[in-house]
Each structure stands twice: as C-alpha cells, then as structure tokens.
C-alpha cells in the first residue's frame, strides 16, 4: 500500500479476513505514474484521493469526528487553514461542524463514497482503502484532557461505528477496507462496538499532543 504521509510505519496484527503483516512505505510521486501535465493536489482532498486510488493499489484516509458527529477527512488536530481565517473560532477540528469544514475545502467520507470514480476503483477494481481514525488532541473538546480518558475512547468508538455503517450501506467489501489507529486500545473498541471490518493497531501509540497527531 502506498501513502503520501506515513514514513515507514508497521501495521501489525491485522484482524478478521486478513492475517498478514503489511508494511506501508512513503510514496514519492514519479512521472512513470502520471502524465507531464499532472500537478499534485493538496493532501486529503477529493482530487488527490481520486488520483491516488486510480494510480495505485489503494489509499489511506485520515478520519476525524466533527462536532455534529460526521466524518471528515483531515490529518491534523487543528483545522489546516491560516489563523486569520479562524475568525475567532476554535482551532480544533472536532469543534467544527461538517458543513463548516467543507466550506473550507475539506472533504467528508460521504463525498468519497458518493464519487463515482472512487466507488468504481474501490468496489469494481478491488482497490484497498485504509481508514486511519485520528484521536482528538489532548486539549480538544472531544479529547481526553487530564481526567476524561473515556471521552477520547467514545470519540474513536463513535467514528468507527459511523464509518462501518456508511461502508456497509454502500456495499464496500470487507476485504477492501481496514480500520486502524495509532492507539493501543483498538481491540477494546472493536470488541465493545462489535466492529466486523478488518482492523489493526499501529505502533507506536502516538500521544495526543502537538498539532500533527
């Protein structure tokens, strides 16, 4: 699997239908994969993900839960826009609604599922899509803070359950997706929520501090 922002992490203990150990390698676009006219789109946009799934064996999505319990494709814990565009709003992704984030140019999981190119590649062409569920920042309203570890777990649990429901509704084959997170408590969430999708825990278990968690 090739991804554009994960350098040399190891997936381990991939469960359910697939019992293999996979390596994820950092992808550097080359001209052999694309035409002279191609220019790289910003990461985690519909255009970049459409290009990625068309020209590779699969793609990775960074999934976060919005304030209205929708799923947005967004890597960083803070909204990836210039500070002067925050207009006094919270910087944490989980504080924004789906519509507010889409107005800033970010795409949702529904946008991907509604895209005919991605749907064809994902289902008909058998491409793999890895969904990395991002834990909210320590200080985010959906984060754990000092004494609210359960809040963080609830955020991940809700996001995974919603994602599973959406993929099931669209008929995404189980073997064409995997849920994962840099979180040592993945198994507990999978068991408690009865998630049937393939899943994996990632190492290391990344602390929820900084801006690129």
Residues covered by each model-derived region:
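Phosphate-group recognition and catalysis centered on beta-loop-alpha active-site segments
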Residues: 1-213
